[in-house]
Amino acid sequence: MIKDERWEGVYSFEDSPYLMETLTDLRKIGTENISFRKGLVRLGRYMGYELTKTMEFEKMPIQTPLEKTQGVFAKDRKNVVIITILRAAFPLMEGLIKNFESAKVGIVSASRGHAPDFNIEMNYIKVPQLNPEDTVIVSDPMIATGSTLIHVLREFKDSKPKRMMIVGVLAAPEGINAVKAEFPDVEIFVTKIDEKLNKDGYIVPGLGDAGDRAFGEPFKVSMLPQMHNLE
């Protein structure tokens, strides 16, 4: 895990050959949906493990079958809330939660419009009660403009949890700048920080639309009436 000196509290995993190989597979245009999803799960699991190293723990006395000794209790690991942004973040969350088995989970449905406005639409939020001792992890594969994450974080800023993190696959400097400008204390962990955004608001070189690549291209709204006629 590498601290990026351009920002406070921003980290990447560019020093991990395993994650870089997994990211390479995700970038390839020919990677199938199932392989893409599995790759996101692997990234989430590895990054979740690395996050546990940043959490507080305390020593505690325990009794083994042979004698008394000292054990470790990672108390922060028991107070995790993972907030997942539909839909591409589901595989990432699946990997994360393997490190935080008792985590509570929140779901947010949010989507970003097209250039030049990039308007954000949020139509569903279901999040557990947040407490002062909680570590909140917002999972979103792509930190592009940062506008979606900013809208999500605004919903919870008054809860004042112990820590607020964003875990993603790729980020653009523009997105990190936007998030940090409004939420300077939020910690950001991504597999890699890419070069920039293009005129359409996509990260480049990037990996395309993570949701479509993980789950397939969705039906267009205009096609929904045709679905009813199939019965």
Curated annotation (Swiss-Prot):
Q: What species was this sequence derived from?
A: Methanococcus maripaludis (strain C6 / ATCC BAA-1332)
**Which EC class is this protein assigned?**
transferase
- Function of the protein: Catalyzes the conversion of uracil and 5-phospho-alpha-D-ribose 1-diphosphate (PRPP) to UMP and diphosphate.
Q: Where does uracil bind?
A: I203, G208, D209, A210
Q: Where does the chain bind GTP?
A: K38, G39, L40, V41, R42
Give the matching InterPro entries. PRibTrfase_dom (IPR000836), PRTase-like (IPR029057), Upp_A (IPR034331), Ura_phspho_trans (IPR005765)
Descriptive protein name:
Uracil phosphoribosyltransferase
Record pathway? Pyrimidine metabolism; UMP biosynthesis via salvage pathway; UMP from uracil: step 1/1
Enzyme Commission code(s) on record: 2.4.2.9
Q: Which family does the UniProt entry place this protein in?
A: Belongs to the UPRTase family.
**Residues the entry annotates as binding 5-phospho-alpha-D-ribose 1-diphosphate:** R87, R112, D140, P141, M142, I143, A144, T145, G146, S147, T148, D209
Pfam families associated with the record: UPRTase
Task: Offer an example of a GO molecular function term for this protein.
Answer: GTP binding
Tell me which cofactor or cofactors this protein depends on. Mg(2+)
Its GO biological process annotations read:
UMP salvage; uracil salvage
Cofactor, how bound (note): Binds 1 Mg(2+) ion per subunit. The magnesium is bound as Mg-PRPP.
Q: Which UniProt keywords apply?
A: Allosteric enzyme, Glycosyltransferase, GTP-binding, Magnesium, Nucleotide-binding, Transferase
Q: How is its activity regulated?
A: Allosterically activated by GTP.
What is the gene called? upp
The record, for HAMAP family, names:
Upp_A (MF_01218_A)
* Top-level division of the source organism's lineage: Archaea
Catalysed transformations (reactions): UMP + diphosphate = 5-phospho-alpha-D-ribose 1-diphosphate + uracil
